[in-house]
From Swiss-Prot:
GO cellular component: extracellular region
Protein name: Peptidoglycan endopeptidase RipA
Taxonomic path: Bacteria, Bacillati, Actinomycetota, Actinomycetes, Mycobacteriales
Function, in words: Peptidoglycan endopeptidase that cleaves the bond between D-glutamate and meso-diaminopimelate. Binds and degrades high-molecular weight peptidoglycan. Required for normal separation of daughter cells after cell division and for cell wall integrity.
Region ranges (Disordered): 177-198, 253-297
Gene name for this UniProt entry: ripA
């Protein structure tokens, strides 16, 4: 009985003691709003999920953008190939015409030599030396007659040798002309074939882009929505973290750990490395500003009036011909700017105006800074497939037809034209335009390439793990962290310093 009473008293005492604990929990819940049914949107798990969502959308955009860039640069390559084939055909035609003139000259030489030989033979026959011996009055006449005969024989042999040489030259030139004709015919066929390939590549790119346009827009919208949601949650998180500081001291709650945000920097661009400094390895840490020098950079205008656009509406052949026409004009602009740049440095211009990197090392840094200054002046200019030439942004082709801007290789073409370096409008060709440097040793002013054989993308390394690029359709010229994914093992250096 005593044991039962004691047990009952214990249970009652426990329930009474539990009342303050329950009341305290309810009070804390009321003060801090932490009901079990309300999930904290700024919780670490939610933030991590949203960050992963943004990263996933970025990755998808990067992959699709890479596929589109590859297709676009394939068209740029095809157009460059057309230009090379047409140049080869024109050179072969000039060689053929020179060969034909050579054959005509050889025929004329044979005809002249034959006439001289015929005249000599007739004179010898009519006035042969046989009667001279009979009419000679003294031995001296005989000696003179003999000498004259020997001279005539030597002259005859000389005329005959010239005739034979002329005939041999004729045969050689006719053979060379035949080879030139075959070469010209093959070059013409190659030019036609390369044009067909370019047309096919352009049509394929048009079809591919049209098919991918919807997906590109969907992914861009998905990425924008995910980023907006992440920004909103981060804002809520920042507001929520400030609330506990205002709570009454009488009812302190354990301080919540700050929500882990993997990257507090601005939202990454598609495919960007979260830590460009770590990714940079041994890349230079040169400051992004121009090197200290006595040059007055303000007097070097990095732009020129825009030259006519490459875009022509209509069939692909018209587009290709227009692009090649603008390339010719762009080359002349490059030559003019090359002369101007060298004159600014106090160096006599090259005969053609094209420096093609042949700039004295003592002026190399100034040249690199001028190239970069030209590029940085275009930040914010839209991406335009096929856009960009030596004078600045231009309307592109197909999807870039309505946009004045640059594509990746067009931006590099524009930047280096300022110092007289002529580049093709194709990243793969630009990759082979200078000295290859291991990417771990790249420095300010080197070109960075992406994709197999540099066929996908090109950018300019600025130093400190940053690069200048015209990345993809829908974007614009901007500075981005260097991406190592897909990078070629070498960068290209056009200017030494």
């Amino acid at each position: 009985m005593r044991r039962t009473v004691r047990a009952l008293a214990t249970r009652v005492h426990g329930r009474v003691c539990a009342v303050p604990l329950v009341v305290g929990m309810l009070l804390a819940t009321a003060l801090y709003g932490g009901g079990p049914a309300a999930a904290d949107p700024a919780a670490p798990d939610n933030l991590a999920t949203l960050v992963a969502k943004v990263a996933s959308a970025d990755q998808k955009l990067q992959e699709l953008g890479a596929a589109i860039q590859t297709q676009q640069e394939t068209v740029n390559k095809a157009i460059v190939d057309v230009q090379a084939a047409r140049d080869a055909a024109a050179a072969a035609q000039r060689e053929l015409e020179a060969g034909q003139r050579g054959v005509a000259d050889a025929n004329a030489a044979i005809e002249a030599a034959q006439k001289r030989f015929d005249s000599f033979a007739a004179a010898t026959y009519m006035n042969g030396p046989s009667r001279s011996y009979l009419t000679a009055t003294d031995p001296a006449d005989i000696v003179n007659t003999t000498a004259t005969g020997q001279a005539l024989i030597a002259s005859s042999q000389q005329v005959m040798a010239k005739l034979q040489r002329a005939r041999t030259e004729q045969v050689n030139r006719e053979s060379a002309a035949r080879l030139a004709k075959e070469k010209a015919d093959q070059a013409a066929r190659d030019a036609e074939s390369s044009q067909d390939n370019a047309v096919a590549a352009l049509k394929q790119a048009q079809q591919t882009f049209n098919a991918q346009q919807g997906e590109l827009e969907r992914l861009a919208a998905e990425r924008a929505a995910a980023q907006a949601e992440l920004d909103s949650v981060r804002k809520v998180s920042a507001t929520g973290n400030a609330a506990p500081a205002a709570a009454p001291a009488a009812a302190p709650a354990p301080a919540a750990a700050p929500a882990p945000v993997p990257n507090s920097a601005p939202a990454p661009v598609p495919g960007a490395q979260p830590n460009p400094q770590a990714a940079a390895g041994n890349w230079d840490r040169a400051p992004s500003g121009p090197a200290s020098s006595g040059q007055n950079w303000a007097v070097w205008d990095p732009t020129l009036p825009a030259i006519p656009s490459a875009f022509v509406s209509g069939d692909p052949i018209a587009i290709i011909n227009a692009v090649l026409g603008i390339a010719s004009t762009s080359a002349q602009v490059t030559a003019d700017m090359g002369r101007s740049f060298l004159q600014k440095l106090g160096i006599l211009p090259t005969p053609t105006g094209f420096t093609n990197g042949a700039i004295p090392r003592v002026y190399g840094r100034e040249a690199v800074e001028y190239v970069i200054r030209r590029g940085m002046s275009q930040i914010g200019v839209p991406y335009s497939w096929g856009g960009g030439n030596a004078a600045g942004p231009s309307r592109g082709i197909d999807s870039g037809a309505g946009t004045v801007g640059f594509d990746c290789s067009g931006l590099m073409l524009y930047m280096f034209a300022g110092v007289g370096i002529k580049l093709d409008h194709y990243s793969g060709s630009q990759y082979n335009a200078g000295r290859k440097i291991p990417s771990s040793q790249m420095r300010r002013g080197d070109m960075i390439f992406y994709g197999p054989n540099a066929s996908q993308h090109v950018a300019m390394y600025l130093g400190n793990g940053q690069m200048l690029e015209a990345p993809y359709t829908g974007s614009h010229v901007k500075v981005s962290p260097v991406r190592t994914s897909g990078m070629t093992p070498y960068v290209t250096r056009l200017i030494e310093y």
